[in-house]
Amino acid sequence: MQFSTPSSARTINRLRVLNLLAREGEFSRADIARRLTLNKPSTSEIVEQLLQEGLVEEKGKAKTANGRRPTTLALQQGSRLVLGVELGSKNTCFTLSDLLGNVLRFERIPTPIKPDAQEHGLTIIKTCLKMRRITKTPIAGITVATSAQISNDSLSILRHDHWPWENVPLAKAISEYTQTPAILVHSMRAMVEAEQWFAGEDQKSFLYVNWGEHISGALVQDNTIVGEKSRFGHLPVRQTGLCRCGGIGCLETVAAGWALSERFAGTSVKDLAQSQDPKVVQALQEAAEAMGIALTSASAITGCNKIILGGGVSNLPDHYISLLQQYYQQHTHHSLANIPVVRSQLKDRSTVLGSVAVALDRWVFQRRMLQTMQGL
């Protein structure tokens, strides 16, 4: 995009107005012009366009101390919807949301242990069609979050580490059958987006760890994800223990949901967390300590300003998380000992809300592009 051309400038300013109303609520035309340093004719033109698109509505007269009362404008949050899909190892979740990310409809279907790409793909398409039929409001786009390797055009799964999926054009098929734009996004990117959109995360440098059935991590630097394809869950923390990857002593062998569940005859981590069995308690303490070891190494390498833990296993009772935090503080370099190590406020909703955030950004608000422009 040539930012210097008039049409591009109008496009950018339209997005700035839309994001202002989405983030901060009602404004008059004059307030928008002042806040974004736009001239009044340009502001009026942009507002008129947004009104015609149905993205913005006039709310009424603002309260003023004196003089003419201006008309306020607000985001028409129900004018468009997005559909976020989490293709998880145990469940596939679908969330239909408005422009503010409010959940209007949620559905969950079990993910088979080793799903057939064609069968499960068809189930996903049918559920997307069902979600599309229950509303008359336009769905701007569909985003599917997955831990798989994704093609450059974000339409196909190239390879999945845990399933026999190769070159599966999932998003392309969803788009063709639903007549709605669709893309794939890596789960780590979705979770980071969720923190920034829905948890108010404003740190420019932080490490995000997805501690769930499997373990992964991503470093965010200057609002950009680096190391999205890192293998955080396979950091060595022990000298024994065969991992599913074929390695020995990986973090996953001690702390991943699959490893903890296998150790106790398939019992879910949620149930294990409530157990008082000494063997279970010891296993969960070892998992917390192993995560502390991995975070100590990651912190020393990255120098991040914050560590955020997401995913299902991160919802262990507080005393296990406190044990992890204590281990980190005691063993990390003194200059890094005081950085926050916290659980995500979004708990186990991070991935599916992240798919919603990516959809909102891609098809409505384009905040990533605006952030990139600010850094030029």
Language model segments and positions:
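ATP-binding/phosphotransfer module of carbohydrate and carboxylate kinases, centering on a glycine-rich
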Residues: 1-61, 65-138, 178, 198-200, ...
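Phosphate-binding/catalytic loop of phosphoryl-transfer enzymes
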Residues: 85, 138-246, 250-258, 354, ...
